[in-house]
Amino acid sequence: MTMAKLFDKVIGIMGFADDDYEDDYFEEEEEKEEVREETRGTGNRKGAQVVSIHTQKQIKVVVMEPQAFEDSQSIADQLRNRRPVIVNLENAERNLAKRIVDFVSGATYALGGNMQKVGNGIFLFVPNNVDISGEMKDDFKEKGFFWSLTK
């Protein structure tokens, strides 16, 4: 390093350097920052349209077998937390099963979700972020719900 460069550096550190040189330096930085901001703005629009599969949250399905009417509130809580619930009422009494299905189907409707009978005494309740494909409605018309059958 030459003596002139060393002297200029010391003068610059002390604040006695030529102001024109500093102004040019800061103007260049400001121009670069503006360009960066414009680039960021266009990048966000492109990024909003692309969804990576790996960033999607995995949905967990909850399986419950309620033994009392009070268990229906925990089923509704799972739906409120946007989790699908499979409810097994095969071993429940008919009146209890009907009350639970009435309560949970009302909660599902209020949350904008759907329900579907999967099997005899087994129901699928899903929140509004989950779609059910495949319908079994014709089976309901022919066979009815399990609590309406006489044994």
UniProtKB/Swiss-Prot annotation:
Cell location: Cytoplasm
InterPro entries named among the record's database cross-references: Cell_div_SepF, Cell_div_SepF/SepF-rel, SepF-like_sf
Gene3D superfamilies in the record: SepF-like protein
Annotated keywords: Cell cycle, Cell division, Cytoplasm, Septation
GO biological process: division septum assembly; FtsZ-dependent cytokinesis
Pfam families: SepF (PF04472)
Tagged with keyword Zinc-finger: no
GO cellular component: cytoplasm
Role this protein plays: Cell division protein that is part of the divisome complex and is recruited early to the Z-ring. Probably stimulates Z-ring formation, perhaps through the cross-linking of FtsZ protofilaments. Its function overlaps with FtsA.
Subunit description: Homodimer. Interacts with FtsZ.
Family: Belongs to the SepF family.
This protein's name: Cell division protein SepF
Gene: sepF
